[in-house]
């Protein structure tokens, strides 16, 4: 059985999609709005921890 060029092309595209997908996810995490929400959540956590007598 001889593999066709079309099958080889699809296999190469599939491998490239797998290789480059983590880079796309990393860019999505660098959103300014998401960072602002994360900072707000941390400051609320720190206030609650300080109110309950936790470490500063």
Curated annotation (Swiss-Prot):
UniProt PTM comment: Contains 1 disulfide bond.
Annotated positions of the Glycine amide modification: 53
Source organism per UniProt: Tetramorium bicarinatum (Tramp ant)
One Pfam family per UniProt: Pilosulin
Family per similarity comment: Belongs to the formicidae venom precursor-01 superfamily.
Keywords: Amidation, Disulfide bond, Secreted, Signal, Toxin
Lineage start: Eukaryota, Metazoa, Ecdysozoa, Arthropoda, Hexapoda
Tissue specificity comment: Expressed by the venom gland.
Entry protein name: U4-myrmicitoxin-Tb1a
Disulfide bond positions: none
